[in-house]
Curated annotation (Swiss-Prot):
Keyword Electron transport: no
Ranges where the B12-binding N-terminal domain occurs: 1-90
Annotated function: Involved in the degradation of the quaternary amines L-proline betaine and L-carnitine. Component of a corrinoid-dependent methyltransferase system that transfers a methyl group from L-proline betaine or L-carnitine to tetrahydrofolate (THF), forming methyl-THF, a key intermediate in the Wood-Ljungdahl acetogenesis pathway. Acts as a methyl group carrier between MtpB or MtcB, and MtqA. A methyl group from L-proline betaine or L-carnitine is first transferred to the corrinoid prosthetic group of MtqC by MtpB or MtcB, respectively, and then transferred from MtqC to THF by MtqA.
Induction context: Up-regulated during growth on proline betaine or L-carnitine.
Record-given protein name: Quaternary-amine-specific corrinoid protein
Domain of life of the organism encoding this protein: Bacteria
UniProt record, GO biological process: homocysteine metabolic process; tetrahydrofolate metabolic process
GO molecular function terms noted in the UniProt entry: cobalamin binding; metal ion binding; methionine synthase activity
GO cellular component, one term: cytosol
Pfam families, sorted: B12-binding, B12-binding_2
The keyword Repressor belongs to this UniProt entry's keyword annotation: no
Subunit structure: The proline betaine:THF methyl transfer system is composed of two methyltransferases, MtpB and MtqA, and the corrinoid protein MtqC. The L-carnitine:THF methyl transfer system is composed of two methyltransferases, MtcB and MtqA, and the corrinoid protein MtqC.
Length: 210
């Protein structure tokens, strides 16, 4: 039985070598799928620590990006043991960067952290046309739609997208995120909530599907 506390701490401390050593040793013991899910849960707990430290100002954006990459690596090591991916999905999220905005670092961090928390994420990429958001939302009927943006112009794009989604009868929860996003912007867009912090954004999504 692996020591999950050590794994959680290693992820929280961003100790890549330690994380990989623990996981490779664990996989070598030919674990069951249920045990592998415990390993994923320990990694997720470590990601929550990273999110908290980021909120406290101990970690920076670069650390969050690294943590997301570390988590992807960890999940890849465990994939052969996790079987067909029958792990319970926390919920489904459709994300993309607002039309006219080409920034994706924040969105990518959010995607990594949401996937780590057990969400199934469909990422439409950057500069996503309003019609694309609407068509995909109608096709996959996600629990949550997330629109990110760094430029001030993204707010108007978010509003146009939000209006189009509502007009199309899409009733997914809508969260918007990025530097220019404020409570006022959230009300203007007609979103259910907003965040400027990927870790906090994931917590909001967890509360919605919890």
């Amino acid at each position: 039985m692996a020591d999950w506390k050590n794994l959680t701490q290693a992820v929280g401390d961003l100790e890549e070598d330690d994380v990989m050593e623990i996981l490779n040793d664990f996989v070598a013991t030919n674990p069951t799928e249920a045990e592998a899910e415990e390993a994923v849960a320990a990694c997720q707990a470590g990601m929550a620590v990273v999110g908290d430290l980021f909120e406290e100002g101990e970690y920076f954006v670069g650390d969050l990006i690294f943590a997301g990459e570390l988590l992807t690596e960890a999940i890849n090591v465990l994939k052969p043991v996790l079987g067909s991916g029958d792990t319970a999905v926390a919920g489904t999220i459709l994300i993309g960067t607002a039309h006219g905005d080409l920034h994706d670092i924040g969105k990518n961090i959010f995607r990594s952290m949401a996937e780590a928390a057990g969400f199934q994420v469909t990422d439409l990429g950057i500069d996503v046309a309003i019609d694309t958001f609407v068509e995909k939302a109608k096709e996959i009927k996600p629990d949550i739609i997330g629109i990110s943006g760094v430029l001030t112009l993204a707010i108007d794009s978010m509003k146009e997208t939000s209006d189009a989604l509502k007009a199309a009868g899409v009733d997914s929860k809508l969260i918007i995120g990025g530097n220019p996003v404020t409570k006022e912007a959230c009300e203007y867009v007609g979103a259910d909530d907003f965040t400027t912090n990927a870790a906090e954004g994931v917590k909001i999504c967890q509360a919605w599907v919890g």
